[in-house]
Swiss-Prot record:
It comes from Listeria monocytogenes serotype 4b (strain F2365). This is Methionine import ATP-binding protein MetN 1. It is an enzyme of class 7 (translocase). It catalyses: L-methionine(out) + ATP + H2O = L-methionine(in) + ADP + phosphate + H(+); D-methionine(out) + ATP + H2O = D-methionine(in) + ADP + phosphate + H(+). Its main location: membrane. One of its GO terms (molecular function) is ATP hydrolysis activity. It is a peripheral membrane protein. InterPro entries: AAA+_ATPase, ABC_transporter-like_ATP-bd, ABC_transporter-like_CS, ACT-like_dom_sf, MetN_ABC, MetN_ABC_transporter-like, NIL_domain, P-loop_NTPase. Keywords: Amino-acid transport, ATP-binding, Cell membrane, Membrane, Nucleotide-binding, Translocase, Transport. The gene is metN1. Part of the ABC transporter complex MetNIQ involved in methionine import. Responsible for energy coupling to the transport system.
């Protein structure tokens, strides 16, 4: 569906060349929700804008449904872009147009018949839950409602792909969750492939099938959401999930625990989240486990239980306890303090 082959993009800033995206290759399957996460300046926004050639890559290929977009004529590219919807952090709504007209006007410009416009606007207002707001103006809407209008506008072109550029970063947690649920609904009911970028791990965790991590324009790691959260390999990825593993407990407090034992992050996947493996550790081995924090995350494709545990005991017993936990299906990782 989406294939990026060694895509690179640079800009000239004050006489200096800045490489925003460097040789990035990603394949996104049809119907998948794929996320890209990274710190500010990692190159995420530039990358997502390369997919519909809002930013034309300096090198590499962007292939959508088998077509290399860079080789298309202007007319062919306009047609191809109709199958790629996009939503942004800033909504980009026309302030003097009603909700209905914000969705309808782009369709009019495309030459869509009036009856078809009416049908589509009503359909997608219903999907985003704003049927009763069709005659309202953007100033009368909340941030979440504005984003829903932007989503309906993107869907009205009936795309096969929806690009999301930090679409939830300006929203409060409750509204963010509502928008994420809407994106899941769109993916499930309409079969639309979603490619999103974010700096929020919660967004990746809640709705993505797979994720890529970017740093300084490079793609440094990619895999399933479960693998990234439990088996991170690159230092940048570990920094991202590190705050999750330590539950944002203050560094000075963690240092006190490290001085008297080992801090380990335990992940229980799926049905194993209910298994009493940790409870049996102190009975089988001469170690004293203390649970410092814990929780259960609901991923798109399963459940992930996580605990931050202080294990006190000598090295031999500690090693035996860790081996036992791993044999019980628990993903174990020592917490490294920054």
């Amino acid at each position: 569906m989406i294939e990026l082959h060694q895509v690179s993009k640079s800009f000239n800033v004050n006489g200096k060349t800045v490489e925003a995206v460097k040789n990035v290759s990603i394949t996104v399957e049809k119907g998948e929700i794929f996320g890209v996460v990274g710190y500010s300046g990692a190159g995420k926004s530039t990358l997502v804008r390369c997919i519909n050639l809002l930013e034309r890559p300096d090198a590499g290929q962007v292939v959508i449904d088998g077509k290399n977009l860079s080789t298309l004529s202007s007319k062919e590219l306009r047609v191809a872009r109709r199958k790629i919807g996009m939503i942004f952090q800033g909504y980009n709504l026309l302030k003097t147009a009603t909700v209905y007209d914000n969705i309808a006007k782009p369709l009019k410009l495309e030459g869509v018949p009036k009856d078809e416009i009416e049908t589509r606007v009503n359909k997608y207002l219903s999907i985003v839950g704003l049927e009763d707001k069709r005659n309202n103006y953007p100033s009368q809407l909340s941030g979440g409602q504005k984003q829903r209008v932007a989503i309906a506008r993107a869907l009205a072109h009936e795309p096969e792909i929806l690009l999301s550029d930090e679409a939830t970063s300006a929203l409060d947690p409750e509204t963010t969750e509502a928008i994420l649920q809407l994106l899941l609904k769109i993916n499930a009911e309409l079969g639309i492939t979603i490619f999103l970028i974010t700096h929020e791990l919660d967004v990746i965790q809640r709705i993505c099938d797979r994720v890529a991590v970017m740093e300084n324009g490079h793609l440094v790691e990619q895999g399933t959401v479960l693998d990234i959260f439990t088996k991170a390999k690159h230092a940048t990825t570990k920094r991202f999930v590190g705050s999750e593993a330590s539950f944002d407990i203050p560094q000075d407090l963690l240092e006190k625990y490290v001085a008297t034992g080992k801090l380990v992050s335990l992940h229980f996947i799926g049905d194993e989240a209910d298994e009493p493996a940790l409870a049996l550790v102190s009975r089988k081995f001469d170690v004293l486990p203390s649970i410092l924090a814990g929780g259960i995350d609901h991923l798109k494709n399963g459940t992930l239980g996580k605990l931050l545990v202080h294990l006190k005991g000598d090295e031999v017993e500690y090693s035996k306890a860790i081996s036992y936990l791993k044999e019980s299906g628990v993903v174990v990782e020592e917490v490294e303090l920054l």
